[in-house]
C-alpha cells in the first residue's frame, strides 16, 4: 500500500511513500498527519492526501516508508483537502504549500520521541538522536 503525502514545509512537494505494515490498512486514513523521512534521516510533517494500491514509480525504484503517524485520527477533512487542492491549482502551488501556510506552526513540525523498553534498561530519545546512533 502506498500514499501521496503533501509536505507541510519547504519544498512543499507531494511525494509517494510506502505505508508500513505495522499498522492495519484501515488505520491509514486520508487527512492523517504523518512523519516522513526526507533526505538523510530528517523527518518532516506531511498530510496523507490519498492512498494508492500501487506506486506510480518506475520499476526498480523503491519507496521510503512513512516513519510514523502523528495522530490517530485524520487532522483534515475531505472538504479542507479539496479546498487546499483547488487553491493550489489556482495559485500554481503544491497543496502542501497552501496547508503549510494555513496550519499552526506546531502542526507543521515533527516532535517525535521513541522509547525502547528492554529487560535490562529503559532508553528514550528523539528521532534526531536515533539517526545519529545509526
Task: Name each model feature, range by range.
Residues 1-134:
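Accessory, non-ATPase domains that flank or precede helicase/AAA+ motor cores in DNA-metabolism machines
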Amino acid at each position: 500500500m502506498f500514499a501521496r503525502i503533501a509536505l507541510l514545509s519547504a519544498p512543499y512537494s507531494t511525494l509517494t511513500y510506502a505505508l508500513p505494515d505495522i499498522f492495519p490498512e484501515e488505520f491509514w486514513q486520508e487527512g492523517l498527519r504523518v512523519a516522513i523521512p526526507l533526505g538523510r534521516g530528517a523527518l518532516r510533517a506531511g498530510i496523507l492526501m490519498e492512498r494508492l494500491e500501487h506506486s506510480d514509480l518506475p520499476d526498480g525504484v523503491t519507496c521510503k516508508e512513512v516513519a510514523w503517524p502523528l495522530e490517530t485520527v485524520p487532522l483534515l477533512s475531505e472538504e479542507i483537502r479539496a479546498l487546499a487542492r483547488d487553491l493550489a491549482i489556482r495559485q500554481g502551488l503544491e497543496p502542501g504549500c497552501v496547508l503549510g501556510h494555513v496550519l499552526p506552526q506546531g502542526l507543521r513540525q515533527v516532535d517525535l520521541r521513541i522509547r525502547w523498553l528492554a529487560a535490562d534498561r529503559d532508553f528514550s530519545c528523539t528521532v534526531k538522536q536515533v539517526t545519529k546512533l545509526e
